[in-house]
Structures are given as C-alpha cells and as structure tokens.
Amino acid sequence: MSKTYWSQRIEELANSEKAVPDAVFFTSEAYRNYTETAAKDMITGVCGYLRRYGYSISEMEEDRRVNALTVEMLRNPEITAYTDGYNICIGTNNSLVTLLDSRELRHYAIQGFRVHEVAHILFTDFPTLKNWAEHLSQGIWWPKIPDRASEKDGAELTKRLKNPGFCKPFVSIAHSIENALEDGFIEREIQEMYGGLATTELATLDEVQISESVSFGEMLKKKCSPFEAMLNQILLYAKYDITMDDG
C-alpha cells in the first residue's frame, strides 16, 4: 500500500476521535503501517543525505535496512520504546504519552519514539556494543585497555572484574550509562540530518521528559536509588545539556 493510503486512513480514524478510543486508534493496523512507513522513509532519507556528502552507503545496504524493519505498537504502560536494530516496539500507553491532553500531542509523542528508535537503527553500532558487553561480562576490557588501568585503582578494578558477583552489576551500570550517552548522540545526529516534522515529534516527547524530570535530591526523597538518581541526571545532560539541581 502507498504512503498516501495510510495517511488517509490515519486521517479518517483521527476524524472519528469520539468513536475510536486511543487504545484502538494507536494500536490499529492503519496506525502501525503509517508509523512503519514513516520509519522506513526516515532510513531512506538519511541514507540519501549521507551519500550526497560522500559517505559510502550503498543502495543495497539501504534497501536491506528498509526491508528488514518492522514496527509493533504495544499497550503495556511499562513500555516506552526499544529496538534491536531491526525491529521497533513502541508503547502507546506509557506516562510520556498519556500525560498529554490531546490526541494530536499524544500522536506526536508516539511518533517521537519512532524518530528516536530509527536514530538508534541508523547510528548505534549494535555489533560493537554487543562485543563490548560480552567481553566486559568476562572481566575483559574491550576494545582496548583503559589508559589508567595500570594505576593502583585501575588495577584493583581490573582484578575485581574477575569476580562474577562484582562484574554483573558493574556491567549493568556501565550499560545504563552507555545507553544514556548514546541517546544524546543519536538524537543530535537525527535532528541534524532529518529535520522538519520529525524534529517536532521528537521535541514533543523530549518536552514531556524534561517536564517530568526532578533533581537528584528529589529523586532520593522519592526513595529512588542513588544510582537511578545519578543516571537520570546523566541522561538529562547527554540529551539536553541540562541538569536538575536542588537549589
């Protein structure tokens, strides 16, 4: 089916808002296809942009990525969005969506998840990250030994990585920090290369996230762990160049 067809179907559903609740609208096959088509168009657009600037991305590689991509819409309120590099799952009922007071804004937020996850598909090096995590899980620095690993504290950390009881939570923490930094990187890249409506969609989602964020101290008062509170500040800084202080 053409992109025009799915856009028309979405408009028909949107115009019947009173008769079609969000639970039906955002998980309908028409909406899923609209979202998947938009995701594939993004990949095509960015690949074309990079080729124009001399990057070696073949049309065969572009087609492979586009044809492999699938999108799934989920109603689980605990799910925001995620991707494995090929498939995108988007939560349509999480708090970053439901906090918004109109269907149009909720639509923009959901599509903001699509923009974010496509950015991961385009700019995150999944094979390298997998290798890094697998080596670290075995207590091995990869792809190279850190510069300060030979110093006293570095040598002690390297030794402790051989202890599975220490290594497992260390890898989990390292992965969480890496993902926060990666989120900042991929959002900057996609906004640079694919502006327009996609930027508006991503901004809608980001504004909700900022508005719901609190300071390190406020998170501790809510009984969050110190690491969770710290990670939230890292994410805010990586994505938006801000932190929430307690002043």
Give the residues covered by each predicted segment.
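Basic/hydrophobic alpha-helical interface regions
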Residues: 1-222, 237-238
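Negatively charged
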Residues: 236-247
